[in-house]
Amino acid sequence: MKNNEVSRIKLPAIFTDNMVFQRRAHVCIWGEAQDTEYIEAAIAGQIRRTKVVDGRFELKLNPMEAGGPYELCVKAMQTDEQGAVNKNESGTIAADTIVFKNVLVGEVWLAGGQSNMELELQNSDNGKEVVAHTQDDLLRFYYTPKVSYICDELLKAEEESCWMKCEPGTTAAWSAVVYYWAVRIRKELDVPVGIIGCNWGGTYAHNWVSRESLLSHERTAHFVTEYEDMVAHQDFDEYLKELDEYREYYKEWVKRVDACYAKNPEIEWSKVLEICGENRWPGPSGPHFEYRPYGLYESMLIRVAPYTIKGALYYQGENDENNNEIYDILLENLITEWRRLWHDDELAFSIVQLPVHDPDTEKTGRGWGGIRRAQDKICRTIKNTSLTVITDCGNKKNIHPTDKKTVGERLAENTLKDIYGLAGYNGNGARLAGYELTCRDGHEGILLHFSGAEDGFYRKKEDCEGAASQEELVRVDNPGEKMVFGAGDSKNVPLGFEIGSRNIAAGSDNDKNEKVTYYRAIAELAGGDIFIYNENVSGPVSARYGNDNYFRPIFLDKCGRPIVPFWI
């Protein structure tokens, strides 16, 4: 049930029937209470009590193993002058009581990020067929209301929100990535799973952290100061008028786009734009703007924190392309902030690295490569984090690729391996294990050694976009035979390997002005090693792989997974 309007107790909206509590953790129960001294919570044979202070309370349940269904009873209690708990005429405790039914205990995760995390199951590959067959009473989902600021609309949306069981009538709008992740986790751990969806398409990392967090670093403080300076000089009434006009325009634009796809599901995005026109996204900025700094932190994230969770699944970064040089700072701040908010210094983060995408046919951008590098750095340097590589799951023209099953299942594999510490799981392909500067057949280059490529490299039978299944793979290197691949494919799409040489700035008499320039590299395969070179590069000093917005990750392991991007 939801909070009783006449009750003296008010719990956050996320507490409803069918919720899932985190196993083996001190589950936090918190809220507000009026005209009462104590709050008592009882579940699965345990009773916990805490004092109400300044109208607020917080208590922790003792850790529980996976199980259920249970009832959670939360009571408001008074004491008499001697400090004894008051009882009514029947001898029972006099209290206002809220009872939550069908509560499970298992694994609880929050799903954060932007539109690729948000993309609904019904809109993913084979989505409608999958939705029709979803049925699992032990898999639950709570979607945090998407409202950009604190208002009556948000309070109403929270009142209507609830934990949903996995069944055809509910799963259509669930995150596709999360659904496939959760199904795999359910199968492997054999415990109930609860997901808290807390994401919004088009968002930046700085939307999901506090004002104080952004101000704490000199390279992120400008997000706050520039926004607040703009608001200080803004005519609020005029802003609201512009916002209403934009929202009405946006609704009509979406209708036109939907009509295009309804008429021709295979229509290219460029054709859609010809018909519907470019969207005037993202609309006017201001206090009600969903993309303002620290906005969704206030209207979404803290509305569900500190509901006890194991960790966060995080798929975001596309919109931070132009912030790629500071994205490592932004992502580290976000992890630190969320861990502070949940009072858990080891809150797990399972991060999806950006796939490939670049609709600009005139040039290949680098912003997404910078985001990938930051994501890689964070997951190598911050404890209890995991990175899932999906460079083979992207699409050049569509920023929202619809194969979310591969993404979700790989994310689950890496979560099981890196967060739960279970053997026998791995969602990523070959990883750079070492390298050496060497010369082959007169070419100066770098010999790359990989772990996870002991069986050599494979590629798809048909080198097209989308993830490869194991049945589609053919080995591309024969033992003892040298095979050479150019810097790009037949369509001049780069294969992702680059080699760097050091150029000394004119007039320099020391190494301080040295600069590394990268060139497309030719790849020569021999077993599980790759030798890269460029005929115009002598004295190579570095290499990188996966730094382009869009490249063709043709070298896969025997399970069809791409090489993990690297920078050396």
PLM region spans:
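Cell-envelope and extracellular/periplasmic
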Residues: 1-568
